[in-house]
């Protein structure tokens, strides 16, 4: 691993994998949260969206990889979309369920103080759903890394998944183990960053 870091080779593959993970999170998390909140608070939205999620969510996301490759090509697009499907489904379910679980008297009490729809979302719904959302994001992050490894072994020339399989096929076990360690450290770094963001976003839980 140290040798790969020194010559910069493994850094290129770490960068490729990290780029795909971050793009998938940035593209999937905001709409998943927004639509999940809508489904949790608006009956019509739940009626329209929940059956679709019930149909698609149980399917193994890797089953969509051939379809995504046909539609988006063999580049980053199909890999990012595959991870995005993983993130979207889990965050949508978490946001919807946590929004539905908010006690109506809590919302009514805030509304009685003159708080309008945006204020209710800002001060009640969003904070109440954030803990579940971050927990789901933590789970989906691990699943996304596993899916990333699989997707990078198909028609790819970079990324830690490709590097691991390439080293294995060349019987270069030191490089293979170095790439596996790099993938584990990448996941650890992302989890630590998520923990730090959780502490910042949920500081109100420590009050009192």
Descriptions of predicted regions:
Residues 1-26:
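Periplasmic/extracellular loop-to-transmembrane helix junction in inner-membrane transport proteins
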Residues 54-90, 97-98:
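Generic hydrophobic transmembrane alpha-helix motif, especially the helices
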Residues 161-198:
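Hydrophobic alpha-helical transmembrane segments of polytopic membrane proteins
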Residues 94-139, 160, 164:
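Short cytoplasmic-facing helical segments at TM-TM junctions of multi-pass membrane proteins
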Residues 7, 11, 15, 45-49, ...:
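Alpha-helical membrane-protein architecture signal
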Residues 198-208:
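Short cytosolic juxtamembrane segments of multi-pass membrane proteins
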């Amino acid at each position: 691993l140290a040798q790969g870091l020194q010559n910069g080779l493994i850094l290129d593959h770490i960068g490729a994998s990290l780029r795909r993970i971050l793009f998938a999170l940035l593209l999937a998390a905001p709409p998943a949260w927004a639509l999940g909140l809508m489904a949790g608070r608006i009956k019509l939205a739940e009626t329209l969206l929940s059956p679709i999620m019930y149909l698609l969510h149980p399917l193994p996301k890797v089953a969509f990889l051939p379809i995504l490759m046909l539609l988006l090509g063999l580049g980053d697009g199909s890999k990012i979309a595959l991870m995005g499907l993983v993130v979207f489904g889990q965050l949508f379910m978490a946001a919807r369920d946590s929004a539905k679980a908010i006690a109506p008297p809590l919302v009514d009490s805030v509304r009685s103080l003159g708080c309008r729809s945006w204020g209710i979302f800002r001060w009640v719904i969003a904070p109440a759903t954030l803990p579940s959302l971050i927990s789901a994001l933590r789970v989906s992050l691990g699943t996304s890394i596993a899916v990333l490894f699989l997707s990078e072994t198909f028609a790819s020339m970079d990324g830690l998944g490709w590097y691991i399989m390439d080293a294995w096929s060349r019987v270069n076990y030191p490089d293979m183990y170095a790439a596996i360690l790099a993938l584990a450290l990448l996941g650890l770094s992302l989890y630590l960053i998520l923990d730090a963001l959780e502490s910042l976003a949920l500081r109100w839980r420590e009050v009192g």
